[in-house]
């Protein structure tokens, strides 16, 4: 456990806080920018969730009952839903939001290394989001799926400008992520307070550091692929057109070389949050700290060399199938290290169960289910049957929708008092957890059965044999959307009626630097660097 000298310098009153819109529009303060990221992520999450409710209403019953057989609109809904949730909800919340706000606090830095770069990193997201939403109203919208596979995304499949606008949106959000990653890496390496070595950093900071490297390595590959697609569509190149000597499979390789690390870009900050939460509410240091760091690094590395498990059905060679099957299964080893280390941390601990701990334990259970179905899908022979069925939809939602989302809620409830100065009512938080837990499981668990029965994804109609589980899934989606609006209600209720939050509402289990500061922290923190002593 770390202790501090010169604590009296941490909460200074000489703040010089800017007023009005200038504080937010022109902000270079890492805490304000982190808050803007989190607010943006909540808004985008509600919008993306409403998109999903629309196509779940279509899927509630067979026969084109809601969208009136407008299959292009259905494809646009699933495309925009996925892009919003990945690029505008989970990443801005976990990596950019909590990362911006808490990394400097956790390492004792006065701010981020490049404050103005931090500002533009956020404001790039706004035009990116507007471009994506506007693309849905252009020439029928981008009905390609979030993967943008040619030839469907080429001029053969989409003659209008919708796909081009969506590509520009992805360019901007990718640039935002890369700039933010550079900022966080420089901050973590150069601005740690005296006495805080790399292996004294909290695991959340480690998770952000590994994620930032993944973004810098993966995002340019996506940018290159969609730029090549853009030139195919507009400038006569044939990168992905067989009639000009190109190959649409090249796009799949490029996309998934980004796309699989993206899965870990989404979940690794969540791993860090869960480590903080479980350690705090078990009143114990995390079990196997160095092993947890090593597991994150290995997950990040191996995540780059197994991309083609998304492509088992495209005609890969036998040797490639063997390699990608084995490599994918190997990822379960470092992930298992993390799961068992969290359980070992709780073992023998003095555990309490406030809302953040409930979401963290819920994450472990649901992410483990998603991991087990991932091992099943890693088998290339089984994947021949299950590829592009609802079994895959269930798998990746158990890791992302029920995994990363639960870590975001855990982090939000854990740190909301610190950010706002108001502590949420515990009973409301626990009700939110149980509504969400029931809703998302009702939504996605039946999809395993649908996938095993052979129901294909991305198809808006289906035989009546699948109607029962689809209705259950759609009811679950409605409950989940209700939970999202209930969460927004909790936020506003807490801001208006919540009790003032103390510097450390969680007790002696919360021993990281941010809990030494007032709630909310001063506008400028650590103007005199704290010194960490063991």
Curated annotation (Swiss-Prot):
InterPro entries associated with the record: Cyt_c_oxase-like_su1_dom, Cyt_c_oxase-like_su1_sf, Cyt_C_Oxase_1, Cyt_c_Oxase_su1_BS, Cyt_c_oxase_su1_dom, Cyt_c_oxidase_su1_bac
Keyword field: Cell membrane, Copper, Electron transport, Heme, Iron, Membrane, Metal-binding, Respiratory chain, Translocase, Transmembrane, Transmembrane helix, Transport
Pfam families xrefs: COX1
Transmembrane as UniProt keyword: yes
Catalytic reaction list: 4 Fe(II)-[cytochrome c] + O2 + 8 H(+)(in) = 4 Fe(III)-[cytochrome c] + 2 H2O + 4 H(+)(out)
Disulfide bonds: none
Binding residues for Fe(II)-heme a: 81, 397
Cellular compartments per GO CC: plasma membrane; respiratory chain complex IV
Enzyme nomenclature, EC number: 7.1.1.9
Residue sites binding Cu cation per the record: 260, 264, 309-310
SUPFAM superfamilies in alphabetical order: Cytochrome c oxidase subunit I-like
Pathway: Energy metabolism; oxidative phosphorylation
Protein name: Probable cytochrome c oxidase subunit 1
Organism for this UniProt entry: Rickettsia prowazekii (strain Madrid E)
